[in-house]
Amino acid sequence: MARIASVNIPDNKRVVVSLTYIYGLGPTMAAEICNKAKISKDKKVKELTDQELIGLRNIIESEYKVEGDLRREVTLNIKKKKDIRCYQGLRHIRKLPVRGQNTHSNARTRKGKAIAIAGKKKAVK
């Protein structure tokens, strides 16, 4: 397995597909990186030479924010929104959907498990 951006990418898959295993790289960016490195998109990772792998590593490290750096940036952005108490920050604090989704009937994933309401017991007749 080749190691790029501290991620083991699978050898038996095409380069474009393997690069998408790295957090922050999707299919479009992976294709763009292959074009910059002058590597065929149909080539498999195990067929790459050491020079091609080094070229891929250099391009990804110098031009793109991936893995730990990207995760850190996202969490800092969320923390900043929470600190300034903007609408999105408040939604994050309350653990509700942030981007305008309905919450009346859905949003169970974001809100967590349904909480039972303790109400009156029905009177026995």
Curated annotation (Swiss-Prot):
GO annotation (BP), single: translation
UniProt xrefs under InterPro entries: Rbsml_uS13_C (IPR027437), Ribosomal_uS13 (IPR001892), Ribosomal_uS13-like_H2TH (IPR010979), Ribosomal_uS13_bac-type (IPR019980), Ribosomal_uS13_CS (IPR018269)
GO MF term list: rRNA binding; structural constituent of ribosome; tRNA binding
PROSITE patterns referenced in this protein's UniProt entry, alphabetically: RIBOSOMAL_S13_1, RIBOSOMAL_S13_2
The species this protein was found in: Rickettsia rickettsii (strain Sheila Smith)
Coiled-coil positions: none
GO cellular component: cytosol; small ribosomal subunit
Protein name: Small ribosomal subunit protein uS13
Oligomeric and partner information: Part of the 30S ribosomal subunit. Forms a loose heterodimer with protein S19. Forms two bridges to the 50S subunit in the 70S ribosome.
HAMAP family with a match to the protein in the record: Ribosomal_uS13 (MF_01315)
UniProt function note: Located at the top of the head of the 30S subunit, it contacts several helices of the 16S rRNA. In the 70S ribosome it contacts the 23S rRNA (bridge B1a) and protein L5 of the 50S subunit (bridge B1b), connecting the 2 subunits; these bridges are implicated in subunit movement. Contacts the tRNAs in the A and P-sites.
Family membership noted in the UniProt record: Belongs to the universal ribosomal protein uS13 family.
Keyword Nucleotide-binding recorded: no
Keyword Cell cycle: no
Alphabetical keyword list: Ribonucleoprotein, Ribosomal protein, RNA-binding, rRNA-binding, tRNA-binding
